Amino acid sequence: MTRISVPAGQERNDGGISVPAGQERSDRGISVVLAGGGTAGHIEPAMAVADALTALDPDVRITALGTERGLETRLVPQRGYHLELITLVPLPRKLSADLFRLPMRVLRAVRQTRRILDEVSADVVVGFGGYVAVPAYLAARSLRTHRRVPVVVHEANASAGWANKVGARSAQRVLSAVPDPGLPHVEVVGVPVREAITSLDRMALRAEARAHFGFADDARVLLVFGGSQGAQSLNRAVAGAAEKLAEQGISVLHAHGPKNTLDLPAPRPGDPPYVAVPYLERMDLAYAAADLAVCRSGAMTVAEVSAVGLPAVYVPLPIGNGEQRLNALPVVEAGGGILVEDRSLTPEFVAETVPGLLNNADTLAAMTAAAALAGHPDAARRVAEVALEVARRARDLRTRR
């Protein structure tokens, strides 16, 4: 079990909890443990809920669980929250020595998590899936009867992963992004998204955003991104259509991933800008600058893009059981985007489809309105409210005993 040090500008209080400078811990505050590490798709919803919890109850105590190999070792301390590390428990996908080591790894991680729950006097565990969620779910229900910690599960994907299927069996409440993710008794709340995105006014920020990236005020802007590492098929298709897009007067903002490069033709005199960057530090400005996006359809991507009312061409990652396609379906069926399979995303498709959307003001306006209506900008607050309700009820029951 490892504690993560606090970054510069923050300080630890006597209880070992990292908090923003000047904010003190109250031992009387509700103690919430957030279990959602590994990838940004698990961490970002947890951090959005952490922010919402703090806004609803300034005395709340928040502890995030993670592993040393997850992105949480960087993202959680950056957001000013305390992180505890436990043993990584990946599920082997084929018969190997790791499969035989799995029971001992699970047991070790559960013991570590149980100790953390005791140390922080946890009132509720909120799990978001991923490798750290299963030990958290098992530890919460394996504590002594009078100290068992209630569990709230949040499933961001349209098809639940195995971790949340385990957690849902004993959870007090099961929250989800869609009505039927394969879990029982779900309450649809959407995917928690950080407040900086849900409060974004694209039109109010548009002039600043376009100036930031070097686009004209009246430009028609296509945003292309494939997650933090980019997406090769998106890169090839859009870069391959660069000349045709330029002929139609379309500007492009393309985040291609830090490990990737783009094969772009030399710009001709008078061509609109094709801005290629490895990574977008300011997604708020990128969303505000854009009229249309071409992107993957991970749960967080769909949640953010729809929350800001940005129409999109969703290209599901062609792996797994089709979860990304299911993630995009509600927005697409509402009219806020279109869906194209990865193998069908070609330069020819981009050159024909994107100008057809960006050059039709009525279609684009209708898609923008539909995308905004399909989003759930209050999801983080709703998850936080449920967590506090469950925690307070559990604390009251313990007090009466």
Curated annotation (Swiss-Prot):
What protein name is recorded for this chain? UDP-N-acetylglucosamine--N-acetylmuramyl-(pentapeptide) pyrophosphoryl-undecaprenol N-acetylglucosamine transferase
Q: Describe the task this protein carries out.
A: Cell wall formation. Catalyzes the transfer of a GlcNAc subunit on undecaprenyl-pyrophosphoryl-MurNAc-pentapeptide (lipid intermediate I) to form undecaprenyl-pyrophosphoryl-MurNAc-(pentapeptide)GlcNAc (lipid intermediate II).
GO biological process assignments: carbohydrate metabolic process; cell division; cell wall organization; lipid glycosylation; peptidoglycan biosynthetic process; regulation of cell shape
Entry binding sites for UDP-N-acetyl-alpha-D-glucosamine: 39-41, 157, 194, 228, 324
User: Which parts of the chain span the membrane according to its record?
Assistant: none
Q: Which UniProt keywords apply?
A: Cell cycle, Cell division, Cell membrane, Cell shape, Cell wall biogenesis/degradation, Glycosyltransferase, Membrane, Peptidoglycan synthesis, Transferase
User: To which protein family does this belong?
Assistant: Belongs to the glycosyltransferase 28 family. MurG subfamily.
**Keyword Membrane recorded:** yes
This enzyme catalyses:
di-trans,octa-cis-undecaprenyl diphospho-N-acetyl-alpha-D-muramoyl-L-alanyl-D-glutamyl-meso-2,6-diaminopimeloyl-D-alanyl-D-alanine + UDP-N-acetyl-alpha-D-glucosamine = di-trans,octa-cis-undecaprenyl diphospho-[N-acetyl-alpha-D-glucosaminyl-(1->4)]-N-acetyl-alpha-D-muramoyl-L-alanyl-D-glutamyl-meso-2,6-diaminopimeloyl-D-alanyl-D-alanine + UDP + H(+)
* CDD domains xrefs: GT28_MurG
Provide a GO CC annotation, any one.
Answer: plasma membrane
Pathway listed: Cell wall biogenesis; peptidoglycan biosynthesis
Please list where the region (Disordered) is annotated.
Answer: 1-24
PANTHER family this protein is in? Answer: GLYCOSYLTRANSFERASE (PTHR21015:SF22), UDP-N-ACETYLGLUCOSAMINE--N-ACETYLMURAMYL-(PENTAPEPTIDE) PYROPHOSPHORYL-UNDECAPRENOL N-ACETYLGLUCOSAMINE TRANSFERASE 1 (PTHR21015)
Its taxonomic path starts at:
Bacteria, Bacillati, Actinomycetota, Actinomycetes, Mycobacteriales
| Bilayer topology | Peripheral membrane protein
Q: Where in the cell is it found?
A: Cell membrane
Top enzyme category: transferase
Organism this protein belongs to: Mycolicibacterium vanbaalenii (strain DSM 7251 / JCM 13017 / BCRC 16820 / KCTC 9966 / NRRL B-24157 / PYR-1)
Listed EC numbers: 2.4.1.227
Q: Does the keyword Cell membrane apply?
A: yes
Gene Ontology molecular function: UDP-N-acetyl-D-glucosamine:N-acetylmuramoyl-L-alanyl-D-glutamyl-meso-2,6-diaminopimelyl-D-alanyl-D-alanine-diphosphoundecaprenol 4-beta-N-acetylglucosaminlytransferase activity; undecaprenyldiphospho-muramoylpentapeptide beta-N-acetylglucosaminyltransferase activity
